[in-house]
Amino acid sequence: MSGVSRRDVLRAAGVAAAGAGANAAAAGPAGEIRVIASGNGLEATRRGYQLIAEGQDPLDAVVAGVAIVEDDPLDTSVGYGGLPNERGVVELDAAVMHGPSHKAGAVAALQNIRHPAQVALRVLRRTDHVLLVGAGALEFARAHGFHEENLLTENARQIWLQWKERLSSEDDWLPEPEPANAAVEAFFRKNSTVVGDTGRLRFRRPTGTIHCSAINAASDMSCTTTTSGMAFKIPGRVGDSPIIGAGLYVDNTVGSCGSTGRGEANLQNLSSFAAVELMRQGASPEEAGMEILRRIAKTTEPRLRDREGRPDFGINFYIMAKDGRYAGVTMHGEATFAVTDSKGSRLEKCRALYP
């Protein structure tokens, strides 16, 4: 994959030089390579780190890293194998943002293309736009040689079908009399409860996604977020992942932030942009993340709160500052995020607003 165009590099260099006196953070000393990601992105961070160490642009590196997860049929929240919309059709969203040029690209409701982050990268490099959606995004992907395929794996199809069969006792769909395969049963045990003795389910729709941010030795930053979105969503629903300022944001003079979890809560607060702005004002990555979680908790509508008044959904943020400091935060419970740097690759714990 080629680097960012020479024109963009020259433009970014000119902007950086012009603003050096106005923002001392832009002219900090060279640091170390670091790549962070959501908990499902450990291999993505390893791959990204390796490519940056070999001299690739951080944006190319993170897009190549998340492709590992987009290819994984066992990750039901991203790419090939992602859970479909309510009609059984897989729709993917992704965005990329390049720190040095401050350019971004995104696609939403994209069908039949397993690497939406790569398509988003083409939007950044080969168009004057930021976001393409639906049929237009697919036409653009075809024009750039991306291969179309059915993204609905057998595992995802069985999960979708069981969801549809168990959704209501008032329709004509009946659950199969024999238990599903072990993987499907495990999925439903984790994400649902049985209502009475009806066999019907009260289902908590999982919201996965992968976010990945990177910084190189020159302290240039980039990031990407890619997802299959909320499971069994209304066709055409778009979450936070492809929205710049929500699913991800980077300011090369300050830092980056990205999110996984309930996209609607993020969209209503433009959380990634807000987190970076808090860092601009002096907050650490963890302080910025915790403040964003508090804002989301404060604005959550009553139907989405538990008996104690707390948000009953999950949402996580992965934040990195220009100086290399980083943090992962989560609304509640336990969550991890992936890190690869000179100390190696590892999962670290996110700090929870509600432990």
Regions found by a protein language model. Give the residues of each.
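Bacterial Sec-dependent signal peptides at the C-terminal "C-region" and cleavage site
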Residues: 20-30
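N-terminal secretory signal peptides and thylakoid transit peptides that target proteins
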Residues: 1-17
